[in-house]
């Protein structure tokens, strides 16, 4: 058990969704039900709390990584037992990167969910490239290229600025980036909440250790 006075927490009040500030996201690691502690969830770790958490006991060895903090908050509110990790902004801060890589080395399995626009796909690709033992196809398991094509056709919004081609490395994300650029359409995470709830449930059941 961690001492509350030594660990910063971030809690959501029942019936209300509060989002973390961009400044806090940019310097911290926020997760729910990843570490085996009885402190309120979600849990936000600051840089000076990194070292003791690298080997802290785990509650789960699965983590759904969510790009947008509003969607993270909604999913946690509706499914308070799900293991979730908030993507740490665009800068991939040092605390976040070290914990993501250390958790993977300890057996953590990840799946990534983000906006289906150029920036979101690039961020997903960057996350996948942090990992040493996990293929990008596994990270993209719940948002595969075939899914992206179908969702863009049904739900996509036209925006040339948000669909410009950007450089990505992983073939799975190259395919998704190409599709977005060809369609000139994007999708925000909030539009896929119903899909997320079904797919995350199935993924957690299929990958449970």
What label would you give each PLM region?
Residues 1-88, 92-104, 119, 125-126, ...:
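Nucleic-acid enzyme cleavage-core boundary/entry regions
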């Amino acid at each position: 058990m961690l001492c509350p006075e030594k660990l910063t927490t971030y809690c959501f009040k029942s019936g209300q969704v509060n989002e973390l500030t961009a400044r806090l996201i940019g310097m911290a690691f926020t997760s729910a039900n990843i570490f085996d502690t009885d402190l309120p969830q979600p849990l936000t770790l600051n840089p000076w709390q990194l070292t003791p958490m690298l080997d802290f006991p785990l509650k789960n060895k699965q983590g759904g990584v969510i790009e947008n903090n509003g969607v993270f908050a909604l999913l946690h509110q509706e499914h308070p037992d799900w293991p979730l990790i908030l993507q740490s902004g665009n800068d991939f801060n040092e605390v976040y990167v070290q914990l993501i890589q250390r958790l993977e080395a300890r057996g953590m399995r990840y799946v990534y969910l983000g906006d289906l626009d150029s920036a979101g796909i690039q961020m997903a690709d960057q996350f996948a490239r942090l990992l040493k033992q996990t293929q990008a196809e596994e990270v993209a398991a719940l948002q595969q290229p075939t899914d992206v094509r179908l969702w863009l056709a049904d739900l996509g919004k036209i925006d040339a600025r948000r669909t410009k081609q950007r450089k990505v490395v992983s073939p799975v994300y190259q395919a998704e980036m190409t599709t977005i650029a060809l369609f000139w359409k994007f999708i925000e995470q909030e539009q896929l909440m119903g899909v997320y709830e079904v797919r995350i449930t199935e993924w957690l059941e299929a990958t449970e250790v």
